[in-house]
């Protein structure tokens, strides 16, 4: 959200990544409705990291399918062992078709803050307004301190 953007910029970042947030927009027509609803209903604790043992970690929605991937990794599975269940095809089965039993969906840590499916324009308008309010607040604090 706008607060996260403002905080990142204040810490010196050039920008932020908003992949999960953009999935939950009206313009994201390729994401299955089940995927979007899972994003809306998820809490911060509803994601896990898969493919860590392969040196290519990625955060996904927690499900029986993704928990199975982690168990196989813990048991020492190689890339070849996991290839069919970590492939782009497995990802597509969920994000396009809504097949949670045979696929997975990427999801960022911000997932618990997503609670609507706006248009991209609405999303940006809200973020910009939040950033502007935050900047005004900071300006007021600085102004007050310089007059002490």
Task: List the model feature ranges, each with a label.
Residues 2-148:
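Conserved active-site-proximal phosphate/metal-binding subdomains
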């Amino acid at each position: 959200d706008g607060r996260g953007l403002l905080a990142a910029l204040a810490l010196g970042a050039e920008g932020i990544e908003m992949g999960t947030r953009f999935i939950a927009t009206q313009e994201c027509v390729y994401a299955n409705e089940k995927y979007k609803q899972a994003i809306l209903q998820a809490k911060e604790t509803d994601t896990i990291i898969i493919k860590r043992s392969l040196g290519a970690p990625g955060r996904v929605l927690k499900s029986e399918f993704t928990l199975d991937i982690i168990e196989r990794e813990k048991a020492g599975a190689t890339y070849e062992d996991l290839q069919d269940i970590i492939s782009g095809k497995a990802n597509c089965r969920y994000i396009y078709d809504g097949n949670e039993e045979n696929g997975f969906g990427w999801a960022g840590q911000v997932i618990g803050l997503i609670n609507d499916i706006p248009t991209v324009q609405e999303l940006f308008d809200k973020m910009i307004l939040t950033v502007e309010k935050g900047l005004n607040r900071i300006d007021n604090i600085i102004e007050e301190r310089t007059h002490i």
